[in-house]
């Protein structure tokens, strides 16, 4: 079970690195500005 969780963490990490899109920052900047 631990192996599956570790694989999921690595997979999600790869997705985040592949798509460094953070909708929170632009949204906050647009709202504040």
Curated annotation (Swiss-Prot):
Q: Does the keyword Coiled coil apply?
A: no
Annotated coiled-coil positions are: none
Distribution of this protein across tissues and organs: Expressed mainly in the testis and prostate.
The places in or outside the cell where this protein is found are: Secreted
One Gene Ontology cellular component annotation held by this UniProt entry? extracellular region
The UniProt keyword set, sorted, is:
Secreted, Signal
Where exactly are the transmembrane stretches of this chain?
A: none
Q: What is its main location?
A: secreted
Does the entry feature the keyword Membrane, yes or no? no
Check the UniProt entry and state the signal peptide residues, or none.
Answer: 1-18
Q: Which family does it belong to?
A: Belongs to the NPY family.
Q: Please report the name of this protein according to its UniProt entry.
A: Putative peptide YY-2
């Amino acid at each position: 079970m631990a192996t599956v969780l570790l694989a999921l963490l690595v997979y999600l990490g790869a997705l985040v690195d592949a798509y460094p899109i953070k909708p929170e920052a632009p949204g906050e900047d647009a709202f504040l500005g």
